[in-house]
């Protein structure tokens, strides 16, 4: 993985994803031992779009590994306001750093960045396309809760059209196989056809599209809630009409399995009531921690720094 850019999780083999999960577990239990792993390294966080968790998570990951961070948060703080292209920015920044994390509102921007850069580029979210490191956090949370990421019924609820975390998760779970997806959304926010095609192309996976959450919540092992994203709408009236379509509260949780896990990529608005936070099935703040650990694993891997005392997985590589 040394020197490798990660634009989608298709850039990693199943074996490499499993290795990241294994590394993250090791890091969590060996915080002091890994604290100098990336000494002398510098991460650039180039965020052309607002972010709290993802940017701070990337930065904290490098700092906890002993490295340093430079970057900007908001396109208004970058030379893009002067007309500089992404390619030129990346060619410049590559001279300063060892790895780049980039978020951009345009789909495909991370790929453009990776082709221009001379150091590894990690996609921190490009428009409504992909969000691979959030998916790594999601996988780590499933692994922690269930001991597996397969043989699950996974409900995805809310904005399935623009939700890049949803698209990334579905496509990656299809690679592992044996997942039944329940896609819960209004007609205006249905899952894109290219994502459905990915499910259809996977013999061991299936999907159902429904509009009513309560009618299916009792069948789910995982409920992945998403917010309706105001910034993706051209018409505010459409946003206002759809934003309160799904609100998960204690009443709905009463219909769910006792061991169901509720995930959410955050930030939330009102789609999960605060009263659900104290339910042991709420796993969304656990996802935040797992996101940092997975980014620590990924950053150290792409720059080629070995974790002290870490022993790689011994299993044979799974083709994907």
From Swiss-Prot:
Q: In its keyword annotation, does this UniProt entry include Transferase?
A: yes
Enzyme Commission code: 2.1.3.2
What reaction(s) does this enzyme catalyze?
carbamoyl phosphate + L-aspartate = N-carbamoyl-L-aspartate + phosphate + H(+)
Does this entry carry the keyword Flavoprotein?
A: no
* Alphabetical list of InterPro entries matching this protein: Asp/Orn_carbamoyltranf_P-bd, Asp/Orn_carbamoylTrfase, Asp/Orn_carbamoylTrfase_sf, Asp_carbamoyltransf, Asp_carbamoyltransf_Asp/Orn-bd
**Which EC class heads this enzyme's classification?**
transferase
- State the pathway, as annotated in the record: Pyrimidine metabolism; UMP biosynthesis via de novo pathway; (S)-dihydroorotate from bicarbonate: step 2/3
- Give the binding site residues for L-aspartate: 82, 164, 227
Lineage: superkingdom: Bacteria
GO MF annotation, one: amino acid binding
Q: Which UniProt keywords apply?
A: Pyrimidine biosynthesis, Transferase
Under the heading SUPFAM superfamilies, the entry gives: Aspartate/ornithine carbamoyltransferase (SSF53671)
Q: Which GO terms describe its biological process?
A: 'de novo' pyrimidine nucleobase biosynthetic process; 'de novo' UMP biosynthetic process; amino acid metabolic process
The UniProt similarity line reads:
Belongs to the aspartate/ornithine carbamoyltransferase superfamily. ATCase family.
Q: What does this protein do?
A: Catalyzes the condensation of carbamoyl phosphate and aspartate to form carbamoyl aspartate and inorganic phosphate, the committed step in the de novo pyrimidine nucleotide biosynthesis pathway.
NCBIfam families named among the record's database cross-references: asp_carb_tr, PRK00856.1
> Oligomeric state and partners?
Heterododecamer (2C3:3R2) of six catalytic PyrB chains organized as two trimers (C3), and six regulatory PyrI chains organized as three dimers (R2).
Protein name, as recorded: Aspartate carbamoyltransferase catalytic subunit
């Amino acid at each position: 993985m040394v020197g490798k850019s990660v634009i989608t999780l298709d850039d990693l083999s199943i074996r490499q994803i499993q290795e990241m999960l294994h590394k993250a577990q090791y890091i969590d239990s060996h915080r002091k031992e890994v604290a100098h792993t990336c000494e002398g390294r510098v991460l650039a966080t180039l965020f052309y779009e607002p972010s709290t968790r993802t940017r701070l998570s990337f930065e904290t990951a490098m700092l906890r590994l002993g490295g340093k961070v430079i970057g900007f948060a908001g396109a208004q703080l970058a030379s893009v306001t002067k007309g500089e292209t992404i390619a030129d920015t990346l060619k410049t920044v590559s001279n300063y750093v060892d790895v780049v994390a980039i978020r951009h509102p345009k789909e495909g921007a991370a790929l453009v960045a990776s082709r221009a850069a001379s150091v590894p580029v990690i996609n921190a979210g490009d428009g409504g396309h992909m969000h691979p490191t959030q998916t790594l956090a999601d996988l780590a949370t499933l692994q922690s809760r269930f001991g597996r990421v397969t043989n699950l019924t996974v409900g995805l609820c809310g904005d399935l059209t623009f939700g890049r975390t949803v698209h990334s998760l579905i496509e990656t779970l299809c690679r592992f196989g044996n997942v039944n997806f329940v896609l819960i959304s209004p007609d205006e926010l249905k899952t894109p056809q290219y994502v459905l095609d990915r499910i259809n192309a996977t013999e061991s996976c299936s999907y159902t599209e429904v509009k009513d959450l309560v009618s299916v919540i009792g069948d789910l092992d995982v409920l992945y809630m998403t917010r309706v994203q105001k910034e993706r709408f051209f018409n505010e009236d459409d946003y206002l009409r759809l934003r309160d379509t799904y609100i998960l509260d204690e009443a709905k949780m009463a219909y769910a399995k006792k061991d169901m896990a509720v995930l959410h990529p955050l930030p939330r608005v009102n789609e999960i009531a605060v009263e659900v936070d104290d339910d042991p099935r709420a796993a969304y703040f656990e996802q935040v921690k797992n996101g940092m650990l997975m980014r620590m694993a990924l950053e150290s891997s792409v720059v080629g720094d070995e974790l002290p005392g870490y022993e790689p997985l011994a299993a044979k590589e799974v083709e994907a």
